[in-house]
Amino acid sequence: MSSADIITLPQILSRVPELVSNLPAMVKGSRMAKTTDTRKPLGLGVAIEHATSINPNGAAVLYQDTELTYKQFNAWANRIADYLASIGLKKGDTIAVNIENRPELLATVVGCAKLGICAALINTSQRGKVLIHSFNLVNPKAAIVGAELVDAIEEVRADLDLKDNFFYFADQDTLENPGDAPEGYKNLATEIKDCSSENPASTKQTFLKDPLFYIYTSGTTGLPKAVVFNHGRWEKAYGGFGFSAVRLGKNDRIYTTLPFYHATGMVVCWASAIANAGSLVIARKFSASGFWDDIRRYNCTAFGYVGELCRYLHEQPEKPNDQDNQIHTIVGNGLRPSIWKDFKQRFGIDRVVELYASSEGNVAFSNVFNFDNTVGFSPVSYAIVKYDKEREEPVRNSNGNMIKVKRGEAGLMLGEITDKTPFDGYTDPEKTEKSIFRDVFKKGDAWFNTGDMMRDIGFRHAQFVDRLGDTFRWKGENVSTTEVEQILDGFDGIQESVVYGVEIPNTNGRAGMAQVRMTCSHEEFDYQGLCAYLKQELPAYAIPVFLRINEQEMETTGTFKHQKNKLKDQKYDLAQQDNPVYVLLPGESCYQRLDEETQKGIDGGAYRF
Protein backbone atom coordinates (compact mmCIF):
# COMPACT_ATOMS: atom_id res chain seq x y z
CA MET A 1 0.00 0.00 0.00
CA SER A 2 1.18 3.51 -0.82
CA SER A 3 0.90 6.13 1.92
CA ALA A 4 -0.85 8.23 -0.73
CA ASP A 5 -3.81 5.85 -0.47
CA ILE A 6 -4.57 6.96 3.10
CA ILE A 7 -7.72 9.13 3.05
CA THR A 8 -7.36 12.58 4.65
CA LEU A 9 -9.91 15.18 5.76
CA PRO A 10 -8.99 17.67 2.98
CA GLN A 11 -9.58 14.91 0.42
CA ILE A 12 -13.01 14.20 1.88
CA LEU A 13 -13.92 17.90 1.86
CA SER A 14 -12.79 18.27 -1.76
CA ARG A 15 -15.46 15.76 -2.83
CA VAL A 16 -18.35 17.40 -0.98
CA PRO A 17 -19.52 19.77 -3.79
CA GLU A 18 -20.04 16.87 -6.22
CA LEU A 19 -21.92 14.86 -3.62
CA VAL A 20 -24.17 17.79 -2.70
CA SER A 21 -25.43 18.01 -6.29
CA ASN A 22 -26.47 14.34 -6.05
CA LEU A 23 -27.73 14.56 -2.47
CA PRO A 24 -31.46 13.86 -3.08
CA ALA A 25 -30.74 10.59 -4.90
CA MET A 26 -28.13 9.58 -2.34
CA VAL A 27 -30.49 10.24 0.57
CA LYS A 28 -33.19 8.20 -1.16
CA GLY A 29 -30.74 5.37 -1.76
CA SER A 30 -29.49 5.48 1.81
CA ARG A 31 -33.02 5.18 3.16
CA MET A 32 -33.73 2.24 0.89
CA ALA A 33 -30.47 0.58 1.94
CA LYS A 34 -31.52 0.78 5.58
CA THR A 35 -35.13 -0.35 5.20
CA THR A 36 -36.47 -2.69 7.87
CA ASP A 37 -40.21 -2.43 7.10
CA THR A 38 -41.46 -6.00 6.73
CA ARG A 39 -44.94 -4.88 5.56
CA LYS A 40 -43.93 -2.75 2.58
CA PRO A 41 -44.06 -4.39 -0.88
CA LEU A 42 -40.61 -4.15 -2.44
CA GLY A 43 -38.02 -5.94 -4.51
CA LEU A 44 -37.22 -6.67 -8.14
CA GLY A 45 -40.77 -7.05 -9.46
CA VAL A 46 -41.93 -3.82 -7.80
CA ALA A 47 -38.90 -1.96 -9.19
CA ILE A 48 -39.50 -3.18 -12.76
CA GLU A 49 -43.14 -2.11 -12.61
CA HIS A 50 -42.11 1.31 -11.29
CA ALA A 51 -39.50 1.77 -14.03
CA THR A 52 -42.14 0.77 -16.60
CA SER A 53 -44.54 3.39 -15.24
CA ILE A 54 -42.01 6.24 -15.52
CA ASN A 55 -40.32 5.24 -18.79
CA PRO A 56 -42.56 2.74 -20.64
CA ASN A 57 -41.06 3.35 -24.07
CA GLY A 58 -37.46 3.59 -22.89
CA ALA A 59 -35.07 0.74 -23.70
CA ALA A 60 -34.95 -1.72 -20.81
CA VAL A 61 -32.77 -4.46 -22.30
CA LEU A 62 -30.60 -4.58 -25.42
CA TYR A 63 -29.00 -7.78 -26.67
CA GLN A 64 -27.50 -8.38 -30.10
CA ASP A 65 -30.17 -7.01 -32.50
CA THR A 66 -32.98 -7.10 -29.93
CA GLU A 67 -34.17 -3.98 -28.11
CA LEU A 68 -36.99 -4.29 -25.57
CA THR A 69 -38.78 -1.33 -24.04
CA TYR A 70 -39.75 -1.44 -20.37
CA LYS A 71 -43.37 -1.95 -21.45
CA GLN A 72 -42.44 -4.93 -23.64
CA PHE A 73 -40.07 -6.48 -21.11
CA ASN A 74 -42.52 -6.10 -18.21
CA ALA A 75 -45.34 -7.64 -20.25
CA TRP A 76 -43.10 -10.60 -21.12
CA ALA A 77 -42.24 -11.20 -17.47
CA ASN A 78 -45.96 -10.96 -16.62
CA ARG A 79 -46.81 -13.71 -19.13
CA ILE A 80 -44.15 -15.95 -17.59
CA ALA A 81 -45.56 -15.27 -14.11
CA ASP A 82 -49.13 -15.94 -15.27
CA TYR A 83 -48.15 -19.26 -16.81
CA LEU A 84 -46.13 -20.44 -13.82
CA ALA A 85 -49.08 -19.63 -11.55
CA SER A 86 -51.44 -21.52 -13.88
CA ILE A 87 -49.48 -24.76 -13.41
CA GLY A 88 -49.61 -24.47 -9.64
CA LEU A 89 -46.28 -22.85 -8.82
CA LYS A 90 -46.55 -20.35 -6.02
CA LYS A 91 -44.81 -18.10 -3.52
CA GLY A 92 -42.13 -19.99 -1.59
CA ASP A 93 -41.38 -22.47 -4.38
CA THR A 94 -37.98 -22.65 -6.07
CA ILE A 95 -37.24 -22.96 -9.79
CA ALA A 96 -33.80 -23.91 -11.10
CA VAL A 97 -32.75 -21.52 -13.89
CA ASN A 98 -29.90 -22.53 -16.19
CA ILE A 99 -29.62 -20.00 -19.03
CA GLU A 100 -26.63 -18.00 -20.23
CA ASN A 101 -26.62 -14.20 -20.48
CA ARG A 102 -29.61 -13.24 -22.62
CA PRO A 103 -33.03 -11.56 -22.19
CA GLU A 104 -34.84 -14.87 -21.57
CA LEU A 105 -32.89 -15.26 -18.33
CA LEU A 106 -33.83 -11.79 -17.06
CA ALA A 107 -37.51 -12.13 -18.01
CA THR A 108 -37.62 -15.50 -16.23
CA VAL A 109 -36.12 -14.07 -13.03
CA VAL A 110 -38.59 -11.15 -13.00
CA GLY A 111 -41.52 -13.47 -13.74
CA CYS A 112 -40.51 -15.62 -10.78
CA ALA A 113 -39.97 -12.55 -8.59
CA LYS A 114 -43.50 -11.28 -9.25
CA LEU A 115 -44.93 -14.55 -7.92
CA GLY A 116 -42.58 -14.77 -4.94
CA ILE A 117 -40.87 -17.79 -6.51
CA CYS A 118 -37.16 -18.12 -5.77
CA ALA A 119 -34.98 -18.53 -8.88
CA ALA A 120 -31.90 -20.70 -8.29
CA LEU A 121 -29.29 -19.15 -10.59
CA ILE A 122 -27.23 -22.17 -11.62
CA ASN A 123 -23.64 -21.39 -12.57
CA THR A 124 -23.62 -22.13 -16.30
CA SER A 125 -20.04 -23.43 -16.10
CA GLN A 126 -21.00 -26.28 -13.78
CA ARG A 127 -20.95 -29.86 -14.99
CA GLY A 128 -21.12 -33.34 -13.50
CA LYS A 129 -21.18 -33.81 -9.74
CA VAL A 130 -21.11 -30.09 -8.99
CA LEU A 131 -24.14 -29.44 -11.20
CA ILE A 132 -26.05 -32.32 -9.59
CA HIS A 133 -25.27 -30.95 -6.14
CA SER A 134 -26.28 -27.36 -6.96
CA PHE A 135 -29.51 -28.50 -8.56
CA ASN A 136 -30.66 -30.91 -5.86
CA LEU A 137 -29.55 -28.67 -3.00
CA VAL A 138 -32.49 -26.26 -3.46
CA ASN A 139 -35.21 -28.86 -4.16
CA PRO A 140 -36.68 -27.09 -7.22
CA LYS A 141 -40.29 -27.63 -8.31
CA ALA A 142 -39.36 -26.89 -11.94
CA ALA A 143 -36.36 -26.10 -14.13
CA ILE A 144 -36.04 -23.59 -16.96
CA VAL A 145 -33.13 -24.43 -19.25
CA GLY A 146 -31.63 -22.65 -22.23
CA ALA A 147 -30.90 -24.67 -25.37
CA GLU A 148 -27.20 -23.95 -24.87
CA LEU A 149 -27.22 -25.93 -21.60
CA VAL A 150 -29.55 -28.82 -22.39
CA ASP A 151 -26.59 -31.16 -23.00
CA ALA A 152 -25.12 -30.33 -19.58
CA ILE A 153 -28.47 -31.11 -17.91
CA GLU A 154 -29.05 -34.29 -19.91
CA GLU A 155 -25.63 -35.66 -18.87
CA VAL A 156 -26.77 -35.67 -15.23
CA ARG A 157 -30.56 -35.77 -15.51
CA ALA A 158 -30.85 -39.29 -14.14
CA ASP A 159 -29.24 -38.07 -10.91
CA LEU A 160 -31.47 -35.01 -10.49
CA ASP A 161 -34.24 -35.22 -7.90
CA LEU A 162 -36.61 -33.32 -10.21
CA LYS A 163 -38.20 -35.73 -12.67
CA ASP A 164 -40.63 -33.50 -14.60
CA ASN A 165 -41.51 -29.82 -15.13
CA PHE A 166 -38.49 -29.13 -17.34
CA PHE A 167 -38.99 -26.04 -19.51
CA TYR A 168 -36.98 -24.84 -22.48
CA PHE A 169 -35.98 -21.59 -24.17
CA ALA A 170 -34.49 -21.87 -27.66
CA ASP A 171 -31.17 -20.09 -28.18
CA GLN A 172 -32.62 -17.29 -30.30
CA ASP A 173 -35.05 -14.36 -30.00
CA THR A 174 -37.93 -16.44 -28.64
CA LEU A 175 -40.36 -13.51 -28.79
CA GLU A 176 -39.99 -13.61 -32.57
CA ASN A 177 -39.48 -17.34 -33.03
CA PRO A 178 -40.08 -19.74 -30.12
CA GLY A 179 -38.33 -22.66 -31.83
CA ASP A 180 -38.93 -26.32 -30.97
CA ALA A 181 -38.26 -27.95 -27.61
CA PRO A 182 -36.39 -31.27 -27.42
CA GLU A 183 -38.05 -34.38 -26.03
CA GLY A 184 -38.59 -34.17 -22.28
CA TYR A 185 -39.02 -30.38 -22.22
CA LYS A 186 -41.95 -27.98 -22.64
CA ASN A 187 -41.29 -24.90 -24.76
CA LEU A 188 -41.86 -22.03 -22.35
CA ALA A 189 -41.96 -19.44 -25.15
CA THR A 190 -44.91 -21.30 -26.70
CA GLU A 191 -46.66 -22.01 -23.40
CA ILE A 192 -46.79 -18.33 -22.35
CA LYS A 193 -47.99 -17.00 -25.71
CA ASP A 194 -51.64 -16.49 -24.70
CA CYS A 195 -51.03 -15.64 -21.03
CA SER A 196 -51.85 -12.30 -19.41
CA SER A 197 -49.48 -9.37 -19.95
CA GLU A 198 -50.96 -7.41 -17.03
CA ASN A 199 -49.11 -6.86 -13.76
CA PRO A 200 -50.10 -9.64 -11.34
CA ALA A 201 -51.46 -8.72 -7.92
CA SER A 202 -48.82 -11.00 -6.41
CA THR A 203 -46.08 -8.41 -7.13
CA LYS A 204 -47.43 -6.38 -4.22
CA GLN A 205 -47.09 -9.42 -1.97
CA THR A 206 -43.29 -9.63 -2.01
CA PHE A 207 -41.72 -8.33 1.17
CA LEU A 208 -38.37 -7.77 2.86
CA LYS A 209 -37.60 -11.35 3.89
CA ASP A 210 -39.09 -13.19 0.92
CA PRO A 211 -36.46 -15.10 -1.12
CA LEU A 212 -35.74 -13.65 -4.57
CA PHE A 213 -33.00 -15.95 -5.86
CA TYR A 214 -30.23 -18.28 -4.82
CA ILE A 215 -26.67 -17.42 -5.79
CA TYR A 216 -24.08 -20.16 -5.44
CA THR A 217 -20.76 -19.50 -3.73
CA SER A 218 -17.72 -21.67 -3.11
CA GLY A 219 -18.27 -23.93 -0.15
CA THR A 220 -15.58 -24.46 2.47
CA THR A 221 -16.75 -28.08 2.80
CA GLY A 222 -16.23 -28.65 -0.89
CA LEU A 223 -19.36 -28.22 -2.98
CA PRO A 224 -21.10 -24.89 -3.64
CA LYS A 225 -23.34 -23.25 -1.06
CA ALA A 226 -26.68 -21.77 -2.12
CA VAL A 227 -26.97 -18.28 -0.66
CA VAL A 228 -30.44 -16.85 -0.16
CA PHE A 229 -30.71 -13.39 -1.74
CA ASN A 230 -34.05 -12.00 -0.60
CA HIS A 231 -36.09 -9.07 -1.91
CA GLY A 232 -34.93 -6.94 1.01
CA ARG A 233 -31.27 -7.40 0.12
CA TRP A 234 -32.04 -6.62 -3.50
CA GLU A 235 -33.87 -3.45 -2.41
CA LYS A 236 -30.88 -2.40 -0.33
CA ALA A 237 -28.51 -2.94 -3.26
CA TYR A 238 -30.97 -1.13 -5.55
CA GLY A 239 -30.83 1.86 -3.22
CA GLY A 240 -27.20 1.68 -2.14
CA PHE A 241 -25.69 1.05 -5.57
CA GLY A 242 -28.40 2.21 -7.98
CA PHE A 243 -29.24 5.55 -6.39
CA SER A 244 -26.41 6.37 -3.97
CA ALA A 245 -23.24 5.10 -5.66
CA VAL A 246 -23.62 4.57 -9.41
CA ARG A 247 -26.26 7.27 -10.06
CA LEU A 248 -27.19 6.60 -13.70
CA GLY A 249 -30.04 8.43 -15.45
CA LYS A 250 -32.80 7.21 -17.78
CA ASN A 251 -30.67 8.05 -20.83
CA ASP A 252 -27.69 6.04 -19.57
CA ARG A 253 -26.85 2.60 -20.86
CA ILE A 254 -24.80 0.19 -18.76
CA TYR A 255 -23.01 -2.64 -20.58
CA THR A 256 -22.26 -5.93 -18.89
CA THR A 257 -20.51 -9.09 -19.98
CA LEU A 258 -20.53 -10.40 -16.41
CA PRO A 259 -22.46 -13.64 -15.82
CA PHE A 260 -25.88 -13.15 -14.27
CA TYR A 261 -25.40 -16.07 -11.89
CA HIS A 262 -23.15 -13.69 -9.92
CA ALA A 263 -24.37 -10.70 -7.95
CA THR A 264 -22.19 -8.07 -9.68
CA GLY A 265 -24.05 -8.59 -12.96
CA MET A 266 -27.46 -9.66 -11.71
CA VAL A 267 -27.75 -7.20 -8.83
CA VAL A 268 -25.30 -4.31 -9.10
CA CYS A 269 -25.33 -3.68 -12.86
CA TRP A 270 -29.00 -4.41 -13.42
CA ALA A 271 -30.20 -2.48 -10.36
CA SER A 272 -28.09 0.49 -11.48
CA ALA A 273 -30.01 0.52 -14.78
CA ILE A 274 -33.44 0.01 -13.22
CA ALA A 275 -32.98 2.73 -10.57
CA ASN A 276 -33.83 5.56 -12.96
CA ALA A 277 -35.29 3.40 -15.75
CA GLY A 278 -32.10 3.35 -17.80
CA SER A 279 -30.93 0.59 -20.12
CA LEU A 280 -29.06 -2.67 -19.57
CA VAL A 281 -26.96 -3.84 -22.53
CA ILE A 282 -26.06 -7.53 -22.36
CA ALA A 283 -23.21 -9.43 -23.97
CA ARG A 284 -23.28 -13.22 -23.92
CA LYS A 285 -19.54 -13.50 -23.26
CA PHE A 286 -16.63 -11.15 -22.69
CA SER A 287 -14.43 -10.33 -25.69
CA ALA A 288 -11.44 -8.06 -25.12
CA SER A 289 -11.07 -7.35 -28.84
CA GLY A 290 -14.76 -6.62 -29.39
CA PHE A 291 -15.53 -4.85 -26.11
CA TRP A 292 -15.13 -1.23 -27.22
CA ASP A 293 -16.87 -1.89 -30.54
CA ASP A 294 -19.92 -3.00 -28.55
CA ILE A 295 -19.63 0.06 -26.30
CA ARG A 296 -19.73 2.32 -29.36
CA ARG A 297 -22.41 0.32 -31.18
CA TYR A 298 -24.87 0.62 -28.30
CA ASN A 299 -23.78 4.13 -27.16
CA CYS A 300 -23.07 2.85 -23.66
CA THR A 301 -22.20 5.32 -20.91
CA ALA A 302 -21.21 2.84 -18.17
CA PHE A 303 -20.07 -0.74 -17.80
CA GLY A 304 -19.71 -3.40 -15.15
CA TYR A 305 -16.38 -5.07 -14.48
CA VAL A 306 -14.31 -7.45 -12.45
CA GLY A 307 -10.57 -6.98 -12.17
CA GLU A 308 -9.70 -9.57 -14.81
CA LEU A 309 -11.88 -7.80 -17.36
CA CYS A 310 -10.07 -4.50 -16.87
CA ARG A 311 -6.68 -6.22 -17.06
CA TYR A 312 -7.56 -7.87 -20.36
CA LEU A 313 -8.73 -4.53 -21.79
CA HIS A 314 -5.60 -2.82 -20.50
CA GLU A 315 -3.39 -5.45 -22.17
CA GLN A 316 -4.94 -4.84 -25.59
CA PRO A 317 -2.70 -2.80 -27.93
CA GLU A 318 -3.33 0.92 -27.58
CA LYS A 319 -5.42 2.45 -30.36
CA PRO A 320 -5.94 6.06 -31.46
CA ASN A 321 -9.67 5.72 -30.71
CA ASP A 322 -9.30 4.39 -27.15
CA GLN A 323 -11.09 7.49 -25.84
CA ASP A 324 -13.72 7.44 -28.58
CA ASN A 325 -16.46 6.33 -26.23
CA GLN A 326 -19.16 7.81 -24.01
CA ILE A 327 -18.23 5.90 -20.86
CA HIS A 328 -18.24 8.13 -17.77
CA THR A 329 -18.73 5.51 -15.02
CA ILE A 330 -17.62 1.93 -14.42
CA VAL A 331 -18.81 -0.22 -11.53
CA GLY A 332 -17.46 -3.48 -10.17
CA ASN A 333 -14.71 -4.96 -8.06
CA GLY A 334 -11.08 -6.01 -8.29
CA LEU A 335 -9.52 -3.19 -10.33
CA ARG A 336 -5.80 -3.50 -9.62
CA PRO A 337 -4.07 -0.45 -8.07
CA SER A 338 -1.19 -1.01 -10.50
CA ILE A 339 -3.39 -0.12 -13.49
CA TRP A 340 -6.19 1.94 -11.86
CA LYS A 341 -5.04 5.45 -12.84
CA ASP A 342 -3.64 4.40 -16.23
CA PHE A 343 -6.89 2.64 -17.07
CA LYS A 344 -8.98 5.70 -16.27
CA GLN A 345 -6.70 7.99 -18.26
CA ARG A 346 -6.34 5.73 -21.30
CA PHE A 347 -10.08 5.26 -21.81
CA GLY A 348 -11.23 8.65 -20.54
CA ILE A 349 -13.21 7.35 -17.56
CA ASP A 350 -14.35 9.85 -14.91
CA ARG A 351 -15.67 7.60 -12.13
CA VAL A 352 -14.64 4.18 -10.87
CA VAL A 353 -17.34 2.89 -8.54
CA GLU A 354 -15.28 0.09 -7.04
CA LEU A 355 -17.34 -1.86 -4.55
CA TYR A 356 -17.01 -4.60 -2.01
CA ALA A 357 -19.84 -6.98 -1.23
CA SER A 358 -20.49 -10.70 -1.23
CA SER A 359 -23.57 -12.71 -2.11
CA GLU A 360 -23.95 -13.91 1.46
CA GLY A 361 -22.45 -11.01 3.42
CA ASN A 362 -24.08 -8.16 5.35
CA VAL A 363 -21.44 -5.47 4.84
CA ALA A 364 -20.81 -3.50 1.67
CA PHE A 365 -18.53 -0.68 0.52
CA SER A 366 -18.82 1.53 -2.56
CA ASN A 367 -16.55 4.25 -3.88
CA VAL A 368 -19.07 7.10 -3.67
CA PHE A 369 -16.30 9.69 -3.17
CA ASN A 370 -14.48 8.52 -6.33
CA PHE A 371 -11.06 8.05 -4.72
CA ASP A 372 -8.43 5.87 -6.36
CA ASN A 373 -7.37 2.43 -5.09
CA THR A 374 -10.18 1.82 -2.62
CA VAL A 375 -13.36 -0.24 -2.36
CA GLY A 376 -14.81 2.94 -0.94
CA PHE A 377 -16.97 3.89 2.00
CA SER A 378 -19.40 1.88 4.12
CA PRO A 379 -22.25 3.39 6.14
CA VAL A 380 -22.98 0.16 8.02
CA SER A 381 -21.41 -1.22 11.18
CA TYR A 382 -18.21 -3.13 10.42
CA ALA A 383 -14.86 -3.83 12.05
CA ILE A 384 -11.42 -4.76 10.73
CA VAL A 385 -9.74 -6.88 13.41
CA LYS A 386 -6.26 -8.26 13.93
CA TYR A 387 -5.80 -11.75 12.50
CA ASP A 388 -3.21 -14.45 13.19
CA LYS A 389 -2.53 -16.20 9.87
CA GLU A 390 -0.51 -18.99 11.44
CA ARG A 391 -3.25 -19.91 13.92
CA GLU A 392 -5.90 -19.01 11.34
CA GLU A 393 -8.04 -17.07 13.79
CA PRO A 394 -8.65 -13.50 14.98
CA VAL A 395 -6.49 -12.20 17.81
CA ARG A 396 -8.28 -11.66 21.15
CA ASN A 397 -7.03 -9.65 24.11
CA SER A 398 -6.86 -10.75 27.75
CA ASN A 399 -10.57 -9.96 28.12
CA GLY A 400 -11.43 -12.24 25.25
CA ASN A 401 -12.35 -9.39 22.90
CA MET A 402 -11.10 -8.97 19.35
CA ILE A 403 -8.80 -6.04 18.56
CA LYS A 404 -9.48 -3.46 15.84
CA VAL A 405 -6.54 -2.60 13.58
CA LYS A 406 -5.11 0.92 13.36
CA ARG A 407 -5.36 3.09 10.27
CA GLY A 408 -3.00 1.73 7.59
CA GLU A 409 -3.09 -1.80 9.03
CA ALA A 410 -4.74 -4.87 7.53
CA GLY A 411 -7.01 -7.32 9.29
CA LEU A 412 -10.09 -9.50 8.98
CA MET A 413 -13.28 -7.75 7.88
CA LEU A 414 -16.37 -8.42 10.01
CA GLY A 415 -19.93 -7.15 9.55
CA GLU A 416 -22.11 -6.62 12.62
CA ILE A 417 -25.35 -8.60 12.51
CA THR A 418 -28.25 -6.29 13.38
CA ASP A 419 -31.88 -5.75 12.34
CA LYS A 420 -30.66 -3.32 9.66
CA THR A 421 -27.77 -5.53 8.55
CA PRO A 422 -28.99 -9.12 8.99
CA PHE A 423 -27.09 -12.18 7.88
CA ASP A 424 -29.60 -14.27 5.90
CA GLY A 425 -27.35 -17.31 5.89
CA TYR A 426 -27.16 -20.45 3.78
CA THR A 427 -29.49 -23.36 3.12
CA ASP A 428 -27.48 -25.32 5.72
CA PRO A 429 -27.94 -23.94 9.29
CA GLU A 430 -24.60 -25.44 10.39
CA LYS A 431 -22.76 -23.52 7.66
CA THR A 432 -24.62 -20.39 8.70
CA GLU A 433 -23.50 -20.69 12.31
CA LYS A 434 -19.87 -21.37 11.32
CA SER A 435 -19.81 -18.00 9.56
CA ILE A 436 -20.67 -16.07 12.73
CA PHE A 437 -18.31 -14.80 15.44
CA ARG A 438 -19.95 -14.16 18.82
CA ASP A 439 -18.88 -12.06 21.83
CA VAL A 440 -16.52 -10.07 19.62
CA PHE A 441 -16.48 -6.75 21.45
CA LYS A 442 -19.14 -7.35 24.09
CA LYS A 443 -21.18 -10.20 25.49
CA GLY A 444 -23.96 -11.25 23.15
CA ASP A 445 -22.91 -9.43 19.98
CA ALA A 446 -22.70 -11.28 16.66
CA TRP A 447 -20.58 -10.53 13.59
CA PHE A 448 -20.42 -12.11 10.12
CA ASN A 449 -16.98 -13.42 9.16
CA THR A 450 -16.37 -12.27 5.58
CA GLY A 451 -13.17 -14.29 5.27
CA ASP A 452 -11.52 -11.27 3.65
CA MET A 453 -8.45 -9.33 4.71
CA MET A 454 -8.97 -5.57 4.35
CA ARG A 455 -6.88 -2.49 5.14
CA ASP A 456 -8.28 0.47 7.07
CA ILE A 457 -7.29 3.61 5.12
CA GLY A 458 -9.29 6.10 7.17
CA PHE A 459 -12.67 7.86 7.16
CA ARG A 460 -14.54 4.55 6.89
CA HIS A 461 -12.70 3.64 3.68
CA ALA A 462 -10.93 0.33 3.08
CA GLN A 463 -8.72 -1.52 0.62
CA PHE A 464 -9.13 -5.17 -0.29
CA VAL A 465 -6.00 -7.19 0.57
CA ASP A 466 -6.65 -10.92 0.23
CA ARG A 467 -9.09 -13.77 0.65
CA LEU A 468 -8.49 -16.13 3.55
CA GLY A 469 -9.05 -19.78 4.08
CA ASP A 470 -10.48 -22.31 1.72
CA THR A 471 -11.36 -20.16 -1.28
CA PHE A 472 -9.44 -17.99 -3.68
CA ARG A 473 -10.48 -15.86 -6.65
CA TRP A 474 -9.39 -16.55 -10.23
CA LYS A 475 -10.85 -15.35 -13.55
CA GLY A 476 -13.40 -13.34 -11.58
CA GLU A 477 -14.73 -16.49 -9.87
CA ASN A 478 -14.42 -17.85 -6.35
CA VAL A 479 -12.76 -21.27 -6.29
CA SER A 480 -13.32 -23.70 -3.43
CA THR A 481 -10.06 -25.46 -2.58
CA THR A 482 -11.96 -28.29 -0.90
CA GLU A 483 -14.15 -28.86 -3.95
CA VAL A 484 -11.09 -29.08 -6.21
CA GLU A 485 -9.30 -31.36 -3.72
CA GLN A 486 -12.26 -33.74 -3.67
CA ILE A 487 -12.34 -33.89 -7.46
CA LEU A 488 -8.55 -34.44 -7.68
CA ASP A 489 -8.67 -37.16 -5.04
CA GLY A 490 -11.30 -38.96 -7.12
CA PHE A 491 -8.85 -39.46 -10.01
CA ASP A 492 -7.15 -42.82 -10.34
CA GLY A 493 -3.48 -42.24 -9.65
CA ILE A 494 -3.80 -39.45 -7.05
CA GLN A 495 -3.57 -40.49 -3.41
CA GLU A 496 -3.89 -37.08 -1.80
CA SER A 497 -4.04 -33.44 -2.81
CA VAL A 498 -3.96 -30.00 -1.26
CA VAL A 499 -5.12 -27.01 -3.29
CA TYR A 500 -4.30 -23.33 -2.81
CA GLY A 501 -4.06 -20.12 -4.81
CA VAL A 502 -0.80 -18.55 -5.97
CA GLU A 503 -0.07 -15.17 -7.48
CA ILE A 504 1.20 -14.86 -11.05
CA PRO A 505 2.72 -11.45 -11.84
CA ASN A 506 0.46 -9.10 -13.80
CA THR A 507 -2.71 -11.12 -13.24
CA ASN A 508 -5.71 -10.60 -10.97
CA GLY A 509 -6.47 -12.95 -8.12
CA ARG A 510 -4.68 -16.24 -7.61
CA ALA A 511 -4.19 -19.16 -9.95
CA GLY A 512 -5.00 -22.64 -8.70
CA MET A 513 -2.08 -24.82 -7.64
CA ALA A 514 -2.30 -28.35 -6.26
CA GLN A 515 0.29 -30.32 -4.37
CA VAL A 516 -0.42 -33.95 -5.22
CA ARG A 517 0.85 -37.31 -4.01
CA MET A 518 0.59 -39.93 -6.72
CA THR A 519 0.35 -43.72 -6.72
CA CYS A 520 3.11 -43.86 -9.34
CA SER A 521 6.13 -41.78 -10.30
CA HIS A 522 5.42 -38.40 -11.84
CA GLU A 523 7.06 -39.53 -15.08
CA GLU A 524 4.54 -42.39 -15.46
CA PHE A 525 1.48 -40.40 -14.44
CA ASP A 526 -1.43 -39.97 -16.92
CA TYR A 527 -1.53 -36.17 -17.26
CA GLN A 528 -3.67 -36.34 -20.42
CA GLY A 529 -6.26 -38.41 -18.57
CA LEU A 530 -6.19 -36.03 -15.61
CA CYS A 531 -6.84 -33.02 -17.86
CA ALA A 532 -9.79 -34.74 -19.54
CA TYR A 533 -11.21 -35.70 -16.13
CA LEU A 534 -10.83 -32.19 -14.69
CA LYS A 535 -12.47 -30.59 -17.74
CA GLN A 536 -15.43 -32.91 -17.25
CA GLU A 537 -15.78 -32.31 -13.51
CA LEU A 538 -14.75 -28.67 -12.98
CA PRO A 539 -15.39 -25.27 -14.53
CA ALA A 540 -12.36 -24.06 -16.51
CA TYR A 541 -11.48 -21.41 -13.92
CA ALA A 542 -11.25 -24.04 -11.14
CA ILE A 543 -8.81 -26.38 -12.93
CA PRO A 544 -5.38 -26.03 -11.27
CA VAL A 545 -2.83 -24.19 -13.39
CA PHE A 546 0.10 -25.78 -11.51
CA LEU A 547 0.77 -29.22 -10.05
CA ARG A 548 3.49 -29.66 -7.43
CA ILE A 549 4.52 -33.29 -7.09
CA ASN A 550 5.10 -34.53 -3.56
CA GLU A 551 6.33 -38.08 -3.02
CA GLN A 552 6.18 -37.93 0.79
CA GLU A 553 3.34 -37.63 3.30
CA MET A 554 1.71 -34.19 3.22
CA GLU A 555 2.91 -31.84 5.96
CA THR A 556 0.12 -31.01 8.42
CA THR A 557 -0.38 -29.10 11.66
CA GLY A 558 -1.10 -30.65 15.04
CA THR A 559 -4.80 -30.49 14.21
CA PHE A 560 -4.14 -32.22 10.86
CA LYS A 561 -4.65 -29.13 8.73
CA HIS A 562 -2.48 -28.85 5.65
CA GLN A 563 0.18 -26.17 6.01
CA LYS A 564 -0.73 -24.01 3.06
CA ASN A 565 1.08 -20.80 4.00
CA LYS A 566 4.50 -22.25 3.18
CA LEU A 567 3.17 -23.69 -0.08
CA LYS A 568 1.66 -20.34 -1.05
CA ASP A 569 4.96 -18.58 -0.36
CA GLN A 570 6.99 -21.04 -2.44
CA LYS A 571 4.26 -21.17 -5.16
CA TYR A 572 5.71 -22.47 -8.47
CA ASP A 573 9.20 -21.02 -7.95
CA LEU A 574 11.66 -23.80 -8.83
CA ALA A 575 14.42 -22.07 -6.87
CA GLN A 576 12.47 -22.56 -3.63
CA GLN A 577 11.76 -26.29 -3.93
CA ASP A 578 13.12 -29.60 -5.13
CA ASN A 579 9.68 -30.87 -6.11
CA PRO A 580 8.86 -31.33 -9.80
CA VAL A 581 6.25 -28.77 -10.92
CA TYR A 582 3.92 -29.12 -13.89
CA VAL A 583 1.98 -26.31 -15.58
CA LEU A 584 -1.11 -26.10 -17.79
CA LEU A 585 -0.19 -23.25 -20.11
CA PRO A 586 -2.87 -21.13 -21.83
CA GLY A 587 -4.19 -22.83 -24.96
CA GLU A 588 -2.62 -26.20 -24.08
CA SER A 589 -4.64 -29.35 -23.43
CA CYS A 590 -2.19 -31.09 -21.09
CA TYR A 591 0.21 -30.35 -18.24
CA GLN A 592 3.91 -30.10 -19.06
CA ARG A 593 6.89 -30.03 -16.75
CA LEU A 594 7.91 -26.54 -15.71
CA ASP A 595 11.49 -25.52 -16.43
CA GLU A 596 13.40 -22.32 -15.66
CA GLU A 597 12.85 -20.85 -19.11
CA THR A 598 9.08 -21.38 -18.96
CA GLN A 599 8.98 -19.98 -15.41
CA LYS A 600 10.76 -16.83 -16.60
CA GLY A 601 8.20 -16.54 -19.39
CA ILE A 602 5.33 -16.87 -16.92
CA ASP A 603 6.82 -14.30 -14.55
CA GLY A 604 7.60 -11.96 -17.45
CA GLY A 605 4.10 -12.03 -18.89
CA ALA A 606 4.89 -14.09 -22.00
CA TYR A 607 1.82 -16.26 -21.36
CA ARG A 608 -1.65 -14.79 -21.07
CA PHE A 609 -3.41 -16.54 -18.21
Residue map of PLM features:
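Structural core segment of the AMP-binding/adenylate-forming
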Residues: 2-16, 86-87, 110, 114-191, ...
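Conserved AMP-binding/adenylate-forming core of the ANL superfamily
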Residues: 36-41, 45, 49, 57-102, ...
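Conserved AMP-binding A3 loop
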Residues: 69-71, 212-236
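AMP-binding/adenylate-forming catalytic core of the ANL superfamily
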Residues: 126-133, 143-146, 303, 357, ...
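Conserved pre-ATP/AMP-binding loop-to-beta segment of ANL
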Residues: 168-170, 190-216, 223, 246-253
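Conserved AMP-binding/adenylation subdomain of ANL enzymes
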Residues: 235-253, 261-301, 316
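Gly/Ser/Thr-rich phosphate-binding loop
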Residues: 275, 297-305, 314-388, 422
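Conserved C-terminal "lid"/linker of ANL adenylate-forming enzymes
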Residues: 498-504, 513-517, 531-609
